[in-house]
Amino acid sequence: MQIVALTLVAFVAIAGASCPYAAPAPAYSAPAASSGYPAPPCPTNYLFSCQPNLAPAPCAQEAPAYGSAGAYTEQVPHYVGSPNREQLQQFHQRIGMAALMEELRGLGQGIQGQQY
């Protein structure tokens, strides 16, 4: 804890030493009936000034109604139940046919590469 406090004091001392001397603030005069605290004067030696130059962004075109989907643009994944017997047979046939085609392509390339 002491190291943190010591480091903080060192940073404050360095920051205070690097800032140019500013004239002391005028004596405080209490406002008549305002609530809150008055803002300090804006320094001129900061990279960003206190008064940002803000402008409202132009509005985009109004989005069409999406119903219950709201503003989501991603497709919601649709999970299905386990496949029936016919779907499994079709899947295995397709996998088998794809493997057979790859095997035949490999044989065709092997035959073409041989010299007689």
Swiss-Prot record:
GO molecular function terms noted in the UniProt entry: structural constituent of vitelline membrane
VM domain mapped to chain residues: 36-73
Keywords: Secreted, Signal, Sulfation
Tissue-specific expression: Expressed in stage 10 egg-chambers, localized in the outer eggshell (chorion membrane).
Main location: secreted
Signal peptide bounds: 1-17
Record protein name field: Vitelline membrane protein Vm32E
Source lineage: Eukaryota, Metazoa, Ecdysozoa, Arthropoda, Hexapoda
Gene name for this UniProt entry: Vm32E
